[in-house]
Regions:
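Short beta-strand segments
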Residues: 25-29, 51-54, 118-120, 150-155, ...
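Conserved loop-alpha-helix segment in the C-terminal half of the alpha/beta-hydrolase fold
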Residues: 146-184
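Generic structural signal for small/hydrophobic residues in well-ordered secondary structure
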Residues: 12, 16, 29-30, 103, ...
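Helix-rich cap/lid subdomain of alpha/beta-hydrolase
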Residues: 59-119, 123, 127-131
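Conserved hydrolase catalytic core segment
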Residues: 19-63
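Active-site loop/oxyanion-hole signature of alpha/beta-hydrolase fold enzymes
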Residues: 1-28
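Serine-hydrolase catalytic core
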Residues: 113, 137-146
């Protein structure tokens, strides 16, 4: 299939290079971090700083949270993939009906939800996953990253909870930054 983590990285990298952007600040949240950090580390001269928020860059030797594993399972087994209801359930406060409707708007029926439903299974884990080598190389670049890296995480996300510590401890550019940990 063409719908893989690696293809998403390649598509975004192609877009980045065609647009020839430089001097950028990368802001990555959720899957934006998994895909975008690969872009940053493959194009270090284009980026001046990084902000990561409730995201990570998976490695085979770092097991994802139990909450993420539950999300993967749920995404494949729930009969009706109600995006708006899921977004409301993942929020600290219940979302208004019109906000839930807005989240559901791109998905008139289940046939439109194939990509959203399959995305959790694209997570690159295990030593045999094709992305393991590329993600390991990306972490090697991050371990040498001296430009600013800021974390802006929430302590209430069971999937990424504590992920800010990895970036703060392992990326030199994270030292001395005004990191944010949002309650809730």
């Amino acid at each position: 299939t063409d719908y893989t983590y690696e293809r998403h990285v390649a598509w975004m990298n192609e877009w980045l290079n065609k647009n020839d952007f430089t001097g950028m600040t990368f802001v990555g949240q959720d899957w934006g971090g998994l895909i975008g950090l690969r872009l940053v580390t493959a194009n270090v001269d284009r980026f001046d700083r990084i902000v990561v928020a409730n995201t990570g860059l998976p490695l085979a030797n770092r097991e994802p949270s139990a909450a993420f594993r539950a999300w993967q399972k749920f995404s494949q087994e729930v009969p009706v993939f109600d995006v708006g209801k899921m977004m409301s359930g993942g929020s600290k406060t219940e979302l208004a009906p019109e906000v839930i409707a807005a989240y559901n708007a791109p998905f008139p029926d289940e046939t439109y939800k194939s990509a959203a439903r399959i995305f959790p299974t694209l997570y690159p884990d295990g030593v045999d996953h094709p992305s393991n080598i590329a993600n390991t190389k990306a972490w090697e670049v991050l371990h040498a990253w001296n430009k600013p890296l800021l974390t802006a995480f929430t302590d209430g996300d069971p999937i990424t909870q504590g992920g800010h510590k990895t970036f703060q401890l392992e990326v030199p550019g994270a030292k001395g930054q005004a990191h944010t940990l949002i309650s809730g």
